[in-house]
């Protein structure tokens, strides 16, 4: 929606024409970008944060340079301390044990070069304060993202703001890791497709209306070939967070390294639901649904490839090594739906969907275990609830698979509790919460088998300016051409220029990340560099 205003010409020089956009050498200064929606265009400003202050123009977000201890249980200082403690525990679980025997000077030198060093800035954090909706009785929710500095053996350092959940890590788990007890480690992460602006609806919601009207939204088919700002920023942020965890685990060939598998949950089934609901309501044709399926399948392959390659690159350039795979736990359901839409022209029931999940394909045993631990009130009643429950299934899958294949008892060798790490946007905390509750039931059903589940939720440093609610690029997509201005209040073309999402990512996360994403978007057919913006 930018045709109503003539934007300035894009130039490389304008990316560095003011102090706010120059690289920062002071490690105590944090740089953020703030995106704003105007009537006919979007704009971005950069801000240096070096003292306690609200993030300019972002409602409910602040930066604390020096958190004072207020003594209250839910104060920012106490929450910050809990986050740092949780991250330290996760680091201890991942850190390779020392080799047994005497430690000479050569061993000390080798360990110093091969072991990453965690430095916690114990007083810096982002604070997210979410106000409840008007007339709601809900409480204000404060979330603390503590600053964590990670120096890796090779490659650039990692500077992140994270919120962590680790309630079920026990002292014995930390002792086991210190003593060298091996445990399987799996990292799960995910990403949505497109953005709600491009889709015209929110995938997790059902049939919706526009601004309270009674007319159901029928979205245009998502033909855009360009990666959205949300997709690019999520790939960058998740990749760097996972790189820190993977290198901490010593997967670069150091003694005592443990195998790490990274599982990417890129949705497909979840994006089939909305057009099928429109079809059932008699609002769209079979041809519309068929084309929608084709476009979603293509985007799934492209974004999965982009995220996989970005993570692999960030890990390898810091001396790590991981195995990355794309989840496919709902393959039996998606195959049935494709067959029904393209060949049979008849939609399966939810019972048909659950049947193929339980009895068809390589994931059937894990699905039987998963569905067996659900209460009757939790069992999916329609396709949308199956799709939403699949997010939880994928986080739990490594444990479900271990139980289903009886590898829990294996060859008799002692093994530590499996470690499952969910790395995701904080908006997906409900997936973690649901998975954690379901995993507790394993203790009763599986003779005490209780996998370790921890959550690491990195905060973005590219914020959207909204009246209320969480800052999110998925819901508030600024488009692919953005006006860079000198000040938040500026709505003038004077002294401004047009930048793209990758330019902003480069300013916040680094030129290397920008260049890598640029190459990978071209590789996977998601490049926005050579074509006009797709509205």
UniProtKB/Swiss-Prot annotation:
Chain positions of motif Conserved DDXXE motif: 424-428
EC number: 6.3.2.-
The keyword Ligase belongs to this UniProt entry's keyword annotation: yes
Gene Ontology molecular function: ligase activity
Biased composition (Basic and acidic residues): 105-114
Pathway(s) of this molecule: Secondary metabolite biosynthesis
Family: Belongs to the arginine-containing cyclodipeptide synthase family.
Domain note: The conserved DDXXE motif is essential for catalytic activity.
Record function comment: Arginine-containing cyclodipeptide synthase; part of the cluster that mediates the biosynthesis of a highly modified cyclo-arginine-tryptophan dipeptide (cRW). Within the pathway, AnoA acts as the scaffold-generating enzyme and is responsible for formation of the cyclo-Arg-Trp diketopiperazine (cRW) from L-arginyl-tRNA(Arg) + L-tryptophanyl-tRNA(Trp). Additional enzymes from the cluster then further modify the cyclo-Arg-Asp diketopiperazine (cRW) scaffold.
The protein's name in its UniProt record: Arginine-containing cyclodipeptide synthase anoA
Species this protein is from: Aspergillus nomiae (Aspergillus nomius)
Taxon lineage: Eukaryota, Fungi, Dikarya, Ascomycota, Pezizomycotina
